Protein backbone atom coordinates (compact mmCIF):
# COMPACT_ATOMS: atom_id res chain seq x y z
CA UNK A 1 0.00 0.00 0.00
CA UNK A 2 2.86 2.40 0.75
CA UNK A 3 4.71 1.79 -2.52
CA UNK A 4 1.48 1.94 -4.55
CA UNK A 5 0.58 5.26 -2.93
CA UNK A 6 4.04 6.70 -3.54
CA UNK A 7 4.12 5.48 -7.16
CA UNK A 8 0.67 6.93 -7.88
CA UNK A 9 1.49 10.30 -6.30
CA UNK A 10 5.19 10.57 -7.21
CA UNK A 11 6.24 10.80 -3.56
CA UNK A 12 8.32 8.74 -1.11
CA UNK A 13 10.66 6.41 -2.98
CA UNK A 14 9.03 7.60 -6.22
CA UNK A 15 9.69 11.32 -5.78
CA UNK A 16 12.35 11.47 -8.50
CA UNK A 17 10.21 9.59 -11.03
CA UNK A 18 7.04 10.39 -12.92
CA UNK A 19 3.85 9.41 -11.08
CA UNK A 20 2.15 6.23 -12.30
CA UNK A 21 -1.26 7.86 -12.44
CA UNK A 22 -3.03 4.87 -14.00
CA UNK A 23 -2.48 2.62 -10.96
CA UNK A 24 -5.77 1.32 -9.60
CA UNK A 25 -6.57 -0.94 -6.63
CA UNK A 26 -8.53 -4.19 -6.68
CA UNK A 27 -8.15 -5.17 -3.02
CA UNK A 28 -6.10 -4.92 0.11
CA UNK A 29 -4.97 -8.46 0.88
CA UNK A 30 -3.01 -8.98 4.10
CA UNK A 31 -0.89 -6.86 6.44
CA UNK A 32 2.86 -6.46 6.03
CA UNK A 33 3.73 -5.83 9.65
CA UNK A 34 6.25 -3.23 10.77
CA UNK A 35 8.66 -4.98 13.11
CA UNK A 36 10.96 -2.89 15.26
CA UNK A 37 13.33 -5.50 16.66
CA UNK A 38 15.67 -4.61 19.52
CA UNK A 39 18.28 -6.57 21.38
CA UNK A 40 16.96 -7.36 24.86
CA UNK A 41 20.19 -6.00 26.35
CA UNK A 42 19.96 -2.66 24.51
CA UNK A 43 17.56 -0.98 26.95
CA UNK A 44 15.19 -0.13 24.10
CA UNK A 45 11.58 -0.46 25.23
CA UNK A 46 10.00 2.25 23.07
CA UNK A 47 10.71 4.13 19.86
CA UNK A 48 11.88 7.08 21.98
CA UNK A 49 14.68 4.88 23.32
CA UNK A 50 16.25 4.63 19.84
CA UNK A 51 17.96 8.00 20.35
CA UNK A 52 21.72 7.49 20.31
CA UNK A 53 21.40 3.77 19.53
CA UNK A 54 22.72 1.76 16.57
CA UNK A 55 19.67 1.31 14.37
CA UNK A 56 19.36 -0.21 10.89
CA UNK A 57 16.66 1.47 8.78
CA UNK A 58 17.02 -0.89 5.79
CA UNK A 59 18.66 -0.21 2.44
CA UNK A 60 18.64 3.15 0.63
CA UNK A 61 15.73 3.31 -1.79
CA UNK A 62 13.65 0.78 0.13
CA UNK A 63 10.07 1.28 1.25
CA UNK A 64 11.08 0.19 4.74
CA UNK A 65 13.51 3.11 5.00
CA UNK A 66 10.76 5.60 4.16
CA UNK A 67 8.37 3.90 6.61
CA UNK A 68 11.05 4.04 9.33
CA UNK A 69 11.60 7.77 8.72
CA UNK A 70 7.85 8.41 9.02
CA UNK A 71 7.72 6.52 12.32
CA UNK A 72 10.78 8.25 13.73
CA UNK A 73 9.29 11.61 12.79
CA UNK A 74 6.06 10.81 14.66
CA UNK A 75 8.18 10.36 17.79
CA UNK A 76 10.11 13.57 17.21
CA UNK A 77 13.24 11.79 15.98
CA UNK A 78 15.29 11.91 12.78
CA UNK A 79 18.08 9.78 11.37
CA UNK A 80 20.53 12.21 12.95
CA UNK A 81 19.21 11.31 16.40
CA UNK A 82 20.24 7.66 15.99
CA UNK A 83 23.40 5.98 14.78
CA UNK A 84 21.78 5.05 11.48
CA UNK A 85 22.81 2.01 9.46
CA UNK A 86 21.36 0.95 6.12
CA UNK A 87 21.38 -2.84 5.97
CA UNK A 88 19.11 -5.61 4.77
CA UNK A 89 17.23 -7.26 7.66
CA UNK A 90 19.29 -10.46 7.55
CA UNK A 91 22.51 -8.42 7.71
CA UNK A 92 21.14 -6.33 10.58
CA UNK A 93 20.11 -9.49 12.43
CA UNK A 94 23.61 -10.91 12.00
CA UNK A 95 25.10 -7.70 13.42
CA UNK A 96 22.72 -7.93 16.37
CA UNK A 97 23.81 -11.50 17.08
CA UNK A 98 27.39 -10.24 17.13
CA UNK A 99 26.52 -7.41 19.52
CA UNK A 100 27.06 -4.71 16.89
CA UNK A 101 23.44 -3.59 16.33
CA UNK A 102 20.87 -2.40 18.86
CA UNK A 103 17.72 -2.38 16.73
CA UNK A 104 16.42 -2.68 13.18
CA UNK A 105 13.24 -2.16 11.20
CA UNK A 106 11.68 -4.90 9.10
CA UNK A 107 8.43 -4.80 7.11
CA UNK A 108 6.85 -8.13 6.26
CA UNK A 109 4.38 -10.76 7.30
CA UNK A 110 4.88 -12.61 10.53
CA UNK A 111 6.48 -14.86 11.49
CA UNK A 112 9.44 -13.52 9.52
CA UNK A 113 12.16 -16.11 9.00
CA UNK A 114 15.11 -13.82 9.73
CA UNK A 115 13.55 -12.63 13.00
CA UNK A 116 12.47 -16.11 14.08
CA UNK A 117 16.01 -17.39 13.52
CA UNK A 118 17.48 -14.44 15.42
CA UNK A 119 15.06 -14.92 18.33
CA UNK A 120 16.10 -18.57 18.63
CA UNK A 121 19.73 -17.52 19.11
CA UNK A 122 19.55 -14.11 20.78
CA UNK A 123 17.20 -12.48 23.28
CA UNK A 124 15.11 -9.86 21.49
CA UNK A 125 12.40 -7.33 22.24
CA UNK A 126 9.68 -6.45 19.76
CA UNK A 127 9.06 -2.74 20.31
CA UNK A 128 5.51 -1.43 20.27
CA UNK A 129 4.49 1.37 17.88
CA UNK A 130 1.25 2.62 19.37
CA UNK A 131 -0.54 5.45 21.15
CA UNK A 132 -0.70 9.05 19.95
CA UNK A 133 2.36 8.62 17.76
CA UNK A 134 0.84 5.69 15.87
CA UNK A 135 -2.41 7.63 15.52
CA UNK A 136 -0.44 10.50 14.01
CA UNK A 137 1.12 8.15 11.46
CA UNK A 138 -2.19 6.58 10.42
CA UNK A 139 -3.87 9.99 10.37
CA UNK A 140 -1.27 11.55 8.08
CA UNK A 141 -0.57 8.50 5.92
CA UNK A 142 -3.65 6.53 4.97
CA UNK A 143 -1.70 3.47 3.83
CA UNK A 144 -0.74 2.61 7.43
CA UNK A 145 -3.06 0.61 9.69
CA UNK A 146 -2.91 -0.69 13.26
CA UNK A 147 -1.69 -4.27 13.63
CA UNK A 148 -0.85 -6.72 16.41
CA UNK A 149 1.85 -9.39 16.55
CA UNK A 150 0.40 -12.16 18.77
CA UNK A 151 2.26 -13.40 21.83
CA UNK A 152 4.47 -16.38 21.02
CA UNK A 153 5.01 -15.45 17.37
CA UNK A 154 8.71 -15.13 18.18
CA UNK A 155 10.64 -16.96 20.87
CA UNK A 156 10.91 -14.87 24.01
CA UNK A 157 8.16 -12.42 23.02
CA UNK A 158 5.46 -13.48 25.46
CA UNK A 159 2.93 -10.68 25.04
CA UNK A 160 0.92 -9.26 22.16
CA UNK A 161 2.76 -6.33 20.57
CA UNK A 162 0.78 -3.47 19.04
CA UNK A 163 2.38 -1.99 15.96
CA UNK A 164 1.55 -0.72 12.47
CA UNK A 165 1.34 -2.36 9.09
CA UNK A 166 1.14 -1.54 5.42
CA UNK A 167 -0.97 -3.67 3.13
CA UNK A 168 0.00 -6.19 0.51
CA UNK A 169 -2.41 -5.15 -2.21
CA UNK A 170 -3.71 -6.32 -5.57
CA UNK A 171 -3.06 -3.55 -8.07
CA UNK A 172 -4.00 -3.13 -11.72
CA UNK A 173 -4.10 -0.45 -14.42
CA UNK A 174 -6.92 1.93 -15.25
CA UNK A 175 -6.57 0.60 -18.81
CA UNK A 176 -7.95 -2.83 -17.86
CA UNK A 177 -11.61 -3.43 -18.80
CA UNK A 178 -14.19 -2.73 -16.11
CA UNK A 179 -16.08 -5.98 -16.59
CA UNK A 180 -12.91 -8.10 -16.39
CA UNK A 181 -11.78 -6.48 -13.13
CA UNK A 182 -15.32 -6.78 -11.75
CA UNK A 183 -15.28 -10.55 -12.41
CA UNK A 184 -11.79 -10.89 -10.91
CA UNK A 185 -12.90 -9.07 -7.75
CA UNK A 186 -16.07 -11.14 -7.55
CA UNK A 187 -14.04 -14.35 -7.93
CA UNK A 188 -11.65 -13.32 -5.16
CA UNK A 189 -14.49 -12.96 -2.69
CA UNK A 190 -16.59 -16.04 -3.49
CA UNK A 191 -17.05 -19.07 -1.22
CA UNK A 192 -14.69 -21.34 -3.18
CA UNK A 193 -11.86 -18.81 -2.95
CA UNK A 194 -12.54 -18.48 0.78
CA UNK A 195 -12.03 -22.23 1.25
CA UNK A 196 -8.77 -22.16 -0.70
CA UNK A 197 -7.45 -19.16 1.22
CA UNK A 198 -8.32 -20.74 4.57
CA UNK A 199 -6.66 -24.04 3.62
CA UNK A 200 -3.42 -22.49 2.36
CA UNK A 201 -0.75 -20.23 3.82
CA UNK A 202 -1.46 -18.57 7.17
CA UNK A 203 -1.65 -15.20 5.43
CA UNK A 204 -4.56 -16.47 3.34
CA UNK A 205 -6.78 -16.44 6.40
CA UNK A 206 -6.10 -12.72 6.77
CA UNK A 207 -7.40 -11.95 3.28
CA UNK A 208 -10.96 -10.93 4.11
CA UNK A 209 -13.71 -8.84 2.58
CA UNK A 210 -13.95 -6.88 5.83
CA UNK A 211 -10.41 -5.55 5.32
CA UNK A 212 -10.51 -5.33 1.51
CA UNK A 213 -10.32 -1.53 1.52
CA UNK A 214 -8.04 -0.99 4.54
CA UNK A 215 -5.10 1.29 3.77
CA UNK A 216 -6.00 1.69 0.09
CA UNK A 217 -4.36 5.00 -0.82
CA UNK A 218 -5.01 5.00 -4.57
CA UNK A 219 -8.29 5.00 -6.51
CA UNK A 220 -10.20 1.76 -6.87
CA UNK A 221 -10.58 0.37 -10.37
CA UNK A 222 -14.18 1.00 -11.50
CA UNK A 223 -14.73 -2.76 -11.84
CA UNK A 224 -13.66 -3.36 -8.25
CA UNK A 225 -15.68 -0.38 -7.06
CA UNK A 226 -18.77 -1.80 -8.78
CA UNK A 227 -18.37 -5.09 -6.89
CA UNK A 228 -17.82 -3.45 -3.50
CA UNK A 229 -20.93 -1.30 -3.92
CA UNK A 230 -22.98 -4.37 -4.81
CA UNK A 231 -21.54 -6.22 -1.79
CA UNK A 232 -22.38 -3.34 0.54
CA UNK A 233 -18.75 -2.68 1.40
CA UNK A 234 -18.94 0.77 -0.21
CA UNK A 235 -21.87 3.08 0.27
CA UNK A 236 -23.50 5.13 -2.46
Language-model segments: which ranges?
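Pocket-lining segment of extracytoplasmic ligand-binding domains
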Residues: 2, 11-13, 42, 79, ...
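Short, solvent-exposed loop/turn elements at domain surfaces
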Residues: 6, 34-36, 136
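Structural recognition of the beta-strand scaffold that forms the well-ordered cores
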Residues: 25, 35-37, 56-57, 103-107, ...
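Short gly/ser/thr-rich secondary-structure transition/capping motifs
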Residues: 17-19, 37-39, 151
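Acidic, polar ligand-binding/catalytic clefts
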Residues: 1-30, 112
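Extracytoplasmic
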Residues: 20-23, 31-33, 52, 121-124, ...
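Bilobed "Venus flytrap"/periplasmic-binding protein-like clamshell domains
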Residues: 28-98, 194, 210, 214, ...
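An extracytoplasmic/periplasmic, membrane-proximal ligand-sensing/linker region
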Residues: 87, 91, 97-98, 108-126, ...
